[in-house]
UniProtKB/Swiss-Prot annotation:
Disulfide bonds: none annotated. This is Phosphate acyltransferase. InterPro entries: FA_synthesis (IPR003664), Phospholipid_synth_PlsX-like (IPR012281). Belongs to the PlsX family. Pathway: Lipid metabolism; phospholipid metabolism. The gene is plsX. NCBIfam families: plsX. The keyword Cytoplasm applies.
């Protein structure tokens, strides 16, 4: 297995990326996994990586967060992201992982690697934390804000395959994000999508409201990119606010500091439950090879989890199984 890594994408690149790669490989010292670390060769060699499974591939430029995605992919052919994507396209690597520009990664996936035949629109699918610790896959969170019912059906199938094959959930429960739990609720899109999901080769359990998204009652939630991105950003904001308020209150007096000390193990567990680092990155489903978008602010540990996610997608042949499930839907 060979993983192509964009070493220059992300807020803390290339250090966090390199350290994440080293950590990932150290956890599997005997496995035949190779990393193609793509980026500025001079900078990458300065980290003196000892593991022979890491091969540096030089790329002269970087696509930044300020670059317009389509223009950047077309003009910066020598960028770390485009070079890494071309390794996957030419079958020199099995998966692509980047913490860089999300729009550019989606564009590279679509126009360099290519789509799965029959999947019209890809979906960005992170795993959200849940109260029971299982996590829930939500797609789409921004790749396609103007989806049709047929696209949501594809998302449901892809999310179900991923939840079963990578997250190890037998017969994952799939729900449709809506403003109410009743079948007749919602707008024209959700009303058109609901009967399609009922007859799909998945375990569809009906609608779910946003307030129940992180309850752990369902394993996959399907929505269009606008609502999904709004849910993602509001959830991140709420979690940050809650943790911030708790920290302020616990540090506000001597007695509250004592209480914090007593509760430290529980608070640590709560922080771990809400931490994005534990869930890897967001899969870009619908692309002809595994593509993982690591969080832009990923530290070494978070990036190593994104590599684990890519490894599992390759091992479990998720793309092949999505293609098979898509054919089942069409029969």
């Amino acid at each position: 297995m060979i993983l192509a890594v964009d070493a220059m994408g992300g807020d803390h690149a290339p250090r966090a990326i390199v350290e994440g790669v080293v950590q990932f490989l150290a956890e599997r010292p005997t496995e035949q996994i190779e990393i193609r670390l793509v980026g500025d060769e001079l900078k990458l060699r300065s980290y003196d990586i000892k593991d022979p499974r890491v091969k540096i591939v030089h790329a002269a430029s970087v696509i930044t967060g300020e670059d317009e995605p389509v223009r950047a992919i077309r003009r910066k052919k020598d960028s770390s992201l485009v070079v890494a994507a071309n390794l996957v396209k030419s079958n020199e690597a099995d998966a692509l992982i980047s913490a860089g520009n999300t729009g550019a990664l989606m564009t590279a996936g679509l126009f360099v690697i290519g789509r799965i035949e029959g999947i019209d629109r890809p979906a960005l699918a992170p795993t959200f934390p849940t109260r029971n610790g299982k996590g829930v896959v939500i797609l789409d969170v921004g790749a396609n804000p103007d989806a049709k019912a047929e696209h949501l059906l594809d998302y449901a199938i892809m999310g179900s395959v991923y939840a079963e094959q990578v997250r190890g959930i037998k017969q994952p429960k799939v729900a449709l994000l809506n403003i109410g739990s009743e079948a007749g609720k919602g707008n024209a899109l959700t009303k058109e999508t609901y009967p399609l999901l009922e007859t799909a080769p998945i375990h569809f359990v009906g609608n779910v409201e946003a307030r129940e998204a992180m309850s752990g009652e369902v394993d996959v939630i399907v929505t269009e990119g606008f609502a999904g991105n709004t849910l993602l950003k509001s959830t991140e904001g709420a979690a940050s606010m809650i943790m911030g308020v708790m920290k302020e209150q616990f540090m506000s007096s001597f007695s509250s500091k004592i209480a914090a000390l007593i509760l430290k193990p529980k608070l640590k567990k709560m922080k771990q439950l809400l931490a994005y680092e534990e869930y890897g990155g967001a899969g870009l489903f619908g692309i002809a090879a595994p593509v993982i978008k690591a969080h832009g602010s990923s530290n070494a540990y978070a990036f190593s989890r994104a590599l684990v996610q890519a490894e599992q997608m390759v091992e479990q042949q998720v793309v092949t199984k999505i293609i098979e499930a898509k054919k089942t839907k069409e029969i």
